[in-house]
Amino acid sequence: MHAIQTEMDQLTHTINQHNIRYYVDDAPSIPDAEYDRLIKRLTELEGDYPQFKSVDSPTQRVGGIALQKFAQITHLKPMLSLDNAFEQADFAAFNKRITDKVDNVDYVCEPKLDGLAVSITYRFGVLERAATRGDGSVGEDITANVRTIRSIPLKLRGEGFPDLVEVRGEVFMPKAAFEVLNQRQISKGDKVFVNPRNAAAGSLRQLDSKITASRALGFYAYALGVVEGESQPMQTSHYGQLTQLQQWGVPVSSEVKVTDSLEKVYAYYADIMARRSALEYEIDGVVIKVNDIAKQQTLGFVAKAPRWAIAYKFPAQEEMTLLESVDFQVGRTGAVTPVARLKPIFVGGVTVSNATLHNADEIARLGVKIGDTVIIRRAGDVIPQIVAIVPEKRPDDAQDIIFPQHCPVCQSIVERLEGEAVARCSGGLFCEAQRKEAIKHFASRKALNIDGMGDKIVEQLIDKELVKTPADLFSLTASSVTMLDRMAMKSATNIVAAIKQAKTTTLARFLYSLGIREVGEATAANLAQHFTEFERIRTASVEQLLEVADVGDIVAKHIRQFFSQPHNIEVIDQLLEAGITWPVIEQADESQLSLKGQTWVLTGTLTQLNRNDAKAQLQALGAKVAGSVSKNTDCLVAGEAAGSKLAKAEELGVKVIDEQALMDLLNAAN
């Protein structure tokens, strides 16, 4: 081996060992100055001899070429959220649900870091890719930025790790680093960050990884994700798996503890809450998980969260401040929401100047007036709420909050339907506020999926009066789009081309794009499959709508009301005249509904067709496609990297087929 290569390999190994001692073992072994000298020498050698640069070189952490945009990554298995407990009774109820189903439960308690959840995949021990949580199914590719975080190993240490290891954890910004960053922002005249979480998220989502590298981000793993090609058995407990990750060089919080009783969980919670301000990072609660992996699989999942874990949040922090005025905002569905404008107050780690008052009933319940001193709480440390007034501080000139009878944006009549708390503008797409949100929704990924039509583009199109309804999008020309700020002809041409391409869609997507209240993707798909023709949907009675799966009385009334509004029908007719089309849906006769009455579940990664297509084809055969396995499930389709759903199906004796068997079934049916 070349002498220079030997020196470079030795430097790489030495620096990576120091990184492990500093970030994983919390036991730095050399002064910072000596560490900097080692990095400087390796950087110089790599510049002169790039052919000898190692894949796990620590110099990769300084950042590379800036990206134009983030690519999308589909997670190997969904990154679910957690249910919350806000008081001891909530956790006691969670514990009862657990102990009713499994015996001898140990819990792992972990600090709930206030950062950004990420997935990091190692293949053959080398960091291959990293992604944000995103919507749980699809995240953004942040591999280049994650490589710059010094506490994250570019290469796993030791041996015995599987061929593929997915590590899930939280990227955060330590409090001290946050203060330094904001001081730097102030000195440059730049905007400061509100809190460490925002700073971490903003730093991690930089298109230029050099910016990420310049900010001191940290990382702690909190779980294993997908594992493939194990050379030895994996640990059978959550705590054991975290220990295994540490042995491979992945940092795990030293605050993680195993408890064997409810009392010890409460003691852990009280202890870490008391030490919260002294920790080097922000936390907003404690995550509590069943330790035994087999018991986790027995307990399973609900739609978006595991049954075996919960986030036990800290009590919201409260402060008093002055309610100076109330504005009324109008949302996409016309909901008129009163927003309190407050004298700015620092509460729960951020400065709060606005808080929702929800609706007229809430204003009446609180008895609040303009000029009152109010108590602000950050519920779950996220959403500012007015929870009470301080009557003794009310001034003589306090003013009643008068709910508007006309929309503050378009002056249409504000209506409040019987049985609903929310008042709504009746203006529909005539209302500019609804118009903006409606067009954003219309162009969104799950609706017509107009590539490049982001929120800021929509806002400019409306502000410049180029667009008033979704139908107007199809009249845009490249030259008119260039009127937008910083919009070159090439970009404008691409947007117009994307709009034209979006004319070909599906009936389900078109229905969803209209923004009918309570009509999400699933309901839109059910409506399309049931009626097969748009004209039948828009003329359907409430009684006919109630025949559709998952459509109840309230949703049926919302649909009927939407199609009874002349301005909505006018826009729909314009859209159809603009050339929006979709494939004809053939009404299957009863003999073709071979899966009618059956409940199917999909899990894992499908390689021959995407999950939405599989779901649609199963529904076309009469099946109901559910999100979780139960004793009522007739069949589970297990794709690659199938996880807990497969284990649950096997436990319950549910029929399991692979993707090829599904394809054979669908091909035979077609």
UniProtKB/Swiss-Prot annotation:
GO terms for molecular function: DNA ligase (NAD+) activity; metal ion binding. Zn(2+) binds at C407, C410, C425, C431. Keywords: DNA damage, DNA repair, DNA replication, Ligase, Magnesium, Manganese, Metal-binding, NAD, Zinc. It comes from the Bacteria. The active site is at K112. SMART domains: BRCT, LIGANc. Its EC number is 6.5.1.2. Residues 590-670 form the BRCT domain. Its cofactor is Mg(2+); Mn(2+). One of its GO terms (biological process) is DNA replication. DNA ligase that catalyzes the formation of phosphodiester linkages between 5'-phosphoryl and 3'-hydroxyl groups in double-stranded DNA using NAD as a coenzyme and as the energy source for the reaction. It is essential for DNA replication and repair of damaged DNA. Belongs to the NAD-dependent DNA ligase family. LigA subfamily. HAMAP family: DNA_ligase_A. PANTHER family: CHROMOSOME TRANSMISSION FIDELITY FACTOR 18 (PTHR23389), DNA LIGASE (PTHR23389:SF9). This is DNA ligase. It comes from Shewanella frigidimarina (strain NCIMB 400). The lineage of its organism: Bacteria, Pseudomonadati, Pseudomonadota, Gammaproteobacteria, Alteromonadales.
